[in-house]
Amino acid sequence: LIIGILTSLFCSIFITRLLIEGVVNKWGKISFSRKWSENLMGNAHFDFLGKSKISYIVMIVVLAVSCVSFAVRGLNMGAEFTGGRAYVIRFDRPVQAEEVRMKLQDVFSGYEDAANVSFEVKQYGNENQMRIVTQYKYDDTSDEATSEVDRILYDALHGLYGYPITFENFRNTQNDINGILTADKIGPSIAKDMTWGAIWSVLFSLIAIGLYISLRFKKWQYATGATTALAFNALVVIGVFSLCYGWLPFNLEVNQAFIAAILTIIGYTINDTVVVFDRIREYLVLYPKRDLRENVNNALNATLSRTINTSGTTLVTLLAILFFGGETIRGFIFALALGVVVGTLSTLFVATPIAYGLMKREGLGKK
């Protein structure tokens, strides 16, 4: 993300300028729109603040449904947060993570107590090494349970080798360089530490962004609106994962990738919110005699085109990956796509109305 941001900044400042200057020098003029899109959303006059009561009701209902689902169904927690076993397995040829995942799924589905157990497959180092994390019998630390998991892995993966590897050689690399290189148990204490680490990372990001907004706009009302909207976004995504896991045709597991998605959503959404708040601050300076409500509504309408275009292009890319990408990243991409949609709506109907309401209560807006 950092590399992408820096690259985009460099291209916007230098490359785009050179291209525009080249076009202008050659043809004398340049157009940034078509006739059909020239005034698209340019003269919008939506009364966003007039719908604030409705938006608050919808927000409360959505949060209530999310909380009920979380209390009743819970979340499909990954092995990082519940405990489990982590393996690094070496093959004698390059293999794909999706290929390994499909083999594991076929074998695990044949075990009655393992049919709904989630597992994670990632390339580890070389193309012929995979890291596999499974929750199967995570609460059983006996040697018998470990041997059973080893046997399941062998049954699933021995066909991917170019020679008939035995179960003993698969478990022990002293006689064969291929097979299980490392096998670790993720105990309850480690899982608990990782759970709290994930929670603190999200809370810290919200606090840091709240402080940044307070310092940038010098009004706590903006920070309150922004952080409330960000927390709402995170809770809605978590609620949808709780409500929909087991119903959608792909895995909605809450793992470290999901936490990364939540943090990405928080960072992405705040961009839209800052753009709107910047325009509100600008209008308050340019039109100090206008009513605060009018300035805020005008700011929302003025930035609406930018908000929709930015979110729309991002969403198109995410949907393409969601539908045509690999199974292992669909849960992560689904969380991002959902976060983009919810984040856009929360900027318009949560963050700004809350900031406006607090500013109005304090008698601000005409300074």
Regions found by a protein language model. Give the residues of each.
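A structural signal for conserved, well-ordered secondary-structure elements
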Residues: 1-367
